[in-house]
Every structure is written in C-alpha cells, then in structure tokens.
Amino acid sequence: MTTSTGDDRIDQLQQAITKSRRYQTVAPATVRRLARAALVASRGDVPDAVKRTKRGLHEIYGAFLPPSAPNYTALLRHLDSAVEAGDDEAVVRWDRRAMSVHMSTRERVPHLDEFYREIFRHVPRPNTLRDLACGLNPLAVPWMGLSDETVYVASDIDARLMDFVGAALTRLGVAHRTSVVDLLEARLDEPADVTLLLKTLPCLETQQRGSGWEVIDIVNSPIIVVTFPTKSLGQRSKGMFQNYSQSFESQASERSCRIQRLEIGNELIYVIHK
C-alpha cells in the first residue's frame, strides 16, 4: 500500500515532469507509473527520481520526436488547404510529411504501399481497426484501403498528439475514436476486428518485462498485427531481427495462436490469428 508520504513524492515528481514542455501532455498514468518505479530505484531521492523518470519517458516517447514540439496547428492548416482544394495528391504528400514528424512512422514512409498491401493480403478488411500506441500511424489510412464504414480506434500516451490525430482524421473523413491510453494501466477488452501494435512491444518490455505478451493476450481481437524494428534509431541492426524473432516466436509457440511472418523495410511483422 502506498503511503501518504509516497503519494506526496509522486505528486512532486509529476509536477516536476509536467513543467517540462516536452512531457507536459503525457498521460498522467504513465508519468505516475514511471515516477513510482523511479522513487523505488532512487531510494526516495526525489531529484534523482526526476532524472530517472525523464530518462524513462525519453526511452518510450521522447526519443521518437524532434527536439522541438511539432507544430500541429500549422500542419492542420496545410491539410485544410489540400482538402478544400480537393487535391488528393496534395493530401497524400501532406500525409507523408506529417508522418515524418515521428521517427517511428518516418522509417515506414518509404514502404507504405508495400507495408499495407502485404498486411491486408493476410488480414481481412476490418469494420473496427484499433491502433494501440499509434503515434502518427493513423495518418497512413489512405494506404490501408479501408471501407468508408470502418471505425479507426486510435490511442497513445500523448494528449497533444491524439488531439492532432483526431483532428486530422476528421478532415480526412475517417470515422474514428481517439483516446489517451497507457497500455500498462488501462483495460484493453473493447472488441475490435483487427488491432495494430506497431513497434510497441520493445517499449513495453523496457518498462515491464513480459508485458508485451500480456497485452497481446488481453487484447480483444481475433487478429493482431505486431511489428518490431530491425534497426535502431541510429540505423544499426545490433542483431535485432534475430533477437526479436527468436523471442517472439518462442513465446508464440507456447500459445494456441497461428502467426505469419513478414519483413518490409526495417520492420519485422507478425500477423497473429488468435
């Protein structure tokens, strides 16, 4: 049971973290969870715990963003211009530019056509598509070939990013729901035909060993698409393909699911059929 003193220190940590412009819109549940672990690791030393919490947030969130916060307002103005002009090619160019703001989707941009063509060769077009820890991936919807009736359910830990994603999907005419969700704190039992977990498991495992498959097991979808990076943000392989594939396939073999493996660009892809 957390003591009142512990709660006070976590409150202190949360206030210190959210003073930083970089982390002020991160889900409170995420900040408090990392702060709690940092307090234990620092033996109650608050200044040290602040550093540890920021380091943890950088690993799972900050490292994927540019040094300065993206100008989402300006991006939406450019999208408005393209949509109002009825210029589909300009919208696609905007999508590519916007997705390049986030490192995870930037790496996927050169391979978008092949990426979604191959995935949806193995996955039926869903009525409900859920994208967990989505980043800016929902902006790739023009490449997915979804029906007009498909509802895109997207979530991430960054409230500012999710406001932007929701506004962009509205302008793109995509039925959607967006929310701020910490995957290690939230219930994930809402049903969806297909769930995307793109480059998410390594970040989960960094925070809590074994949590990647715990999320997969809990998610209420018959089909889950999981991907892993095969190169670091610095474009080094470091044996990542072998490490991720061996670990993932070993865990999958212990479950009654069927998996299909693909590799496109710097991304190892698994389609899981529960």
From Swiss-Prot:
Enzyme category, top tier: transferase
This enzyme's EC code(s): 2.1.1.179
Keywords: Antibiotic resistance, Methyltransferase, rRNA processing, S-adenosyl-L-methionine, Transferase
Catalytic activity of the protein: guanosine(1405) in 16S rRNA + S-adenosyl-L-methionine = N(7)-methylguanosine(1405) in 16S rRNA + S-adenosyl-L-homocysteine
Any Pfam family the entry gives: FmrO
Gene Ontology MF annotations: rRNA methyltransferase activity
GO BP terms, alphabetized: response to antibiotic
Binding-site positions, S-adenosyl-L-methionine: 64, 102-104, 108, 133, 156, 182-183, 198, 207
Lineage top rank: taxon: Bacteria
Family per record: Belongs to the methyltransferase superfamily. Aminoglycoside resistance family.
Job description of the protein: Specifically methylates the N(7) position of guanine 1405 in 16S rRNA. Confers resistance to aminoglycosides.
Note: Protects M.rosea, which is an antibiotic-producing bacterium, against self-intoxication.
Full protein name: 16S rRNA (guanine(1405)-N(7))-methyltransferase
Protein's organism: Micromonospora rosea
Lineage: Bacteria, Bacillati, Actinomycetota, Actinomycetes, Micromonosporales
